Amino acid sequence: MIITRSPLRISLGGGGTDLPSYYREHTGFLVAAAIDKYVYITLHQTFIQELIVKYSKLERVATVDQLEHPIIREAMKAVGVGAPNLEITSMADIPGGTGLGSSGSFTTGLLKALHALKRNIVHPAELAEQACDIEQIGRAHV
């Protein structure tokens, strides 16, 4: 079993101001600080030949392409994880949509777990860049 824990953050910007779609067009800076609240991701290989994904919904599918959750689907594709015998669970200390960067924490934690499953060693800056790219792709599919 793989477990990741990613901190939530308080930012004096927020609302996507830390994403390339915003900062490439507008100048400025962002001040943020991690807090002691977290997003947890667990990955567990199972004996069931299906992909089980638990977040605010439950998905049971045969292939990655069948996943409804755009960030999970695109992260799995990006890392090259397609195993049908996998269970992914997401939990958080605070609900999403609170302005505490939960989508970024979720995405980085998920990518870290998927890379660990593949035994990939990824530099934190590369992980952050990949998470940013995945969030952009995920938002385009919503």
Please provide the spans of the model-predicted regions:
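FAD-binding glycine-rich core of flavoenzymes that anchor FAD
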Residues: 123-127
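Active-site signature of alpha/beta-hydrolase-fold catalytic machinery across serine-
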Residues: 109
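ATP-binding N-lobe of GHMP and related small-molecule kinases
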Residues: 1-100, 112-122, 133
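Intrinsically disordered, low-complexity acidic/Ser/Thr-rich segments used as protein-protein interaction/activation
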Residues: 128-135
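Phosphate-binding site recognition
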Residues: 103
